[in-house]
Amino acid sequence: MYANKVKKIAAVHDLSGMGRVSLTVVIPILSSMGFQVCPLPTAVLSNHTQYPDFSFLDLTDEMPKIIAQWKKLNVQFDAIYTGYLGSPKQIQIVSDFINDFRHEDSLIV
């Protein structure tokens, strides 16, 4: 059996088209370190929120669907990383996600 399995990280964050932030930065950095990054996007933004104006596509209603599919696949994560959460409902979804997917050795960031 292959003993050195690739560690999986769930990255709960937005995807911003401009600004060198969020999933556009996290995925390549963690991937280059040898991790499999599994994004759970919270929103898609045209650019990060420090610009004076931005477009925002809320993915709150999609998050439980993605999580349900991961449960069906019996996915296990070695770490769960959270970034931008756009609403109190997303905070609850992520709290439940962490409770459902964490295990004794999980790193929660």
What does each model-identified segment do?
Residues 3-11, 15-19, 25-109:
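Ribokinase/PfkB-type carbohydrate-kinase core domain
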